[in-house]
């Protein structure tokens, strides 16, 4: 089947460059995991261009894959790559939280904490809906701590100072463990390239500097909450 689950300005380029969704066969994934486990690997990361779209072309889904990966003997921890918040349904979240081996750390694509900016990006979720997904994930894990990382763009065409400040406040509201902050890069071939109200390069860099500072403050606050707690850890070398 031909499936193009890409709805944003930049990501609309992906299907033109890479074609429709092509999910790797689950059997080959599990076989590789067994080989990795036999070689001493204890953690695996499932990653893709659009990870939640896994299985749309084969009649399966990401949750089933995670559940089956967790059954591989020797694999102690499973991580997920970037997830789109609009594709995380309540059932999806509930089933993920039930997988003990899944690390409760999620990279949820944000790009902006301002709904007006998200609309200009043609994102299909609002800042409020994003926050609801975060709340649902935290609720699903109960007393277990859940951490979030994300990406955020500064200076997307049309972003006002007020929009930027709203985005900064959103970072504080969510409490991200880490935020990858970067200035908007004008890419030919994307609709945003021709958008009016392009933000000056110097302003984009300044906003990135400010947001990075805020993100670091939030990170320290998140880490401070772990002081004095006990948990099982997987040592990395």
Whereabouts are the PLM-identified features?
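Conserved SAM/AdoMet-binding glycine-rich loop
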Residues: 38-161
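Terminal RNA-binding accessory module
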Residues: 194-237
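Aromatic/hydrophobic pocket-lining residues that form the small-molecule binding cavity
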Residues: 29, 62, 130, 164-167, ...
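Short glycine-enriched, charge-decorated loop/helix-capping segments at active-site entrances
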Residues: 18-19, 119-125, 194-199
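Short, small-residue-biased leader/transition segments that mark boundaries at the very start
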Residues: 2-9
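N-terminal intrinsically disordered, low-complexity, charge/repeat-rich segments that act as generic
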Residues: 130-140, 144-198
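Detector for the c-type heme attachment site
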Residues: 14-17, 52
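Conserved alpha-helical substructure of the radical SAM core
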Residues: 16-45, 64
